[in-house]
């Protein structure tokens, strides 16, 4: 069984920060999932949200009232905010990290860094910059995608890339995906059939005995964002290759 750390860790550490990533590396997670995005001046930083308001605070701990998008802030402007206080004083002074900081921390380890969102949002030179950064480090990287076009964008830059498929999982789609990606490079992700995933409307993308068996015919099975101990036990019963916690 393998384990992926969601945003580095969201329960005891501030998500998508170096304290979370260092903790995940120390615990020996097989994969760390993160969400790169770009500042106004082109620095690749790590944040799930497009805005700063949920996770960041002013240095005095107060909320950021005005909606601010990361893409509208320079890196220097972003560094004015605190990314740790959302989890308490122990993390005061934590800043939004760059992707390079995470690659540097994972350099030479067996931990895979899973890149979410970026391939969906960016193309051309902005995507080239991410691959160039990855190539400067001895780090394993996987790319989370949901369309065939996104697979092609990744493979154009790295033909042997690790792919996390987070799209449709009907039989026809799975056949097409595995025709593009080698079995050993592919994980197909399903979601637990729980209230917190009510937003997911495609029933074939939720865990069931039938859905999991279908995925395993074509790829390694991942179960995404398992959020409590009872759900972990339930996820184990599907015998996945990897679970995200």
Task: Label each region the model flagged.
Residues 1-245:
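Phosphate-group recognition and catalysis centered on beta-loop-alpha active-site segments
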